[in-house]
Amino acid sequence: MQLPNNNSRSKLIFALDPEGDMDEAIRLVDLLTGHVGMFKIGKEAFTRFGPSFVTSILERGGNVFLDLKFHDIPNTVAMAAEAAVRLGVSMFSIHALGGGAMMERAVESVKNTAAAMGIVPPVLIAVTVLTSLDDSNLEEMGFKCSTGELALKLAITARNAGASGVVASPQDVIPIRKACGKDFVIVTPGIRLSDKVEGDDQKRVLTPREAVAMGADYIVVGRPIRLADDPAVAADMITEEISEGLAH
């Protein structure tokens, strides 16, 4: 499935983690189709609603970013990657901390499965460092480098393994772009508007305009759209910010 990336709306990924039931989730999909480029299904939504939720979005003409961050032994991740391709998603994630061999097997699985199905392979994205973590958290876990240094190392490893790109903090976009090239896809979560959102656990954040101006290919936005009085209007406002960032 080809991903259009030639306009501002296509760069906006909505994090679909509804607090209600399946009907509420589908209501959001129907409301936001045409206002966002892709719907991100994470662990919460996928565990609650299952693969049929992906199918429901695809049937409505939406594109899906399956963000399950596969992180296991290479063979297990390769099989999970095959399943993701067969689901028909446009993009899915693995975790770069799984190592080069794991990522290489995932890349190989995606290519082989897509070729057998006669389809364009989905975009395979490797998660670097979660935006909820800062340098002190890494130190607690035994890392001897900063979040930015680790993200860059993992991005280079992902590129060398053949991944399409990475998920990385907005602050890490510039060094990753410089090291990995202009065709390396960078997806940035941790996107917030000027208003503080209740329950926010993100630590390393930027606005949509700032992230795109720094070179992000896609931005992921959840709460600022989902909790808005009018989610579609909120999505359109973010699209306008993306346009401003592209013109920077």
Where is each model-derived feature located?
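Short, acidic/polar
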Residues: 19-32, 74-83, 147-157, 203-210
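Conserved, mostly hydrophobic/aromatic
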Residues: 14, 39, 69, 92, ...
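Structural motif
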Residues: 34, 60, 87, 161, ...
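Conserved anion-binding
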Residues: 8-10, 76-164, 169-172, 179-183, ...
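Glycine-rich phosphate-binding active-site loops on the catalytic face of alpha/beta enzymes
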Residues: 87-101, 202-234
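Conserved beta-strand positions in the central sheet of alpha/beta enzyme cores
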Residues: 13, 37-40, 65, 93, ...
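C-terminal helical cap(s) of enzyme catalytic domains, especially alpha/beta-barrels
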Residues: 103-113, 212, 225-248
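N-terminal amphipathic alpha-helix/helix-capping segment at the start of soluble metabolic enzymes
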Residues: 1-27, 116-119, 174, 178-181, ...
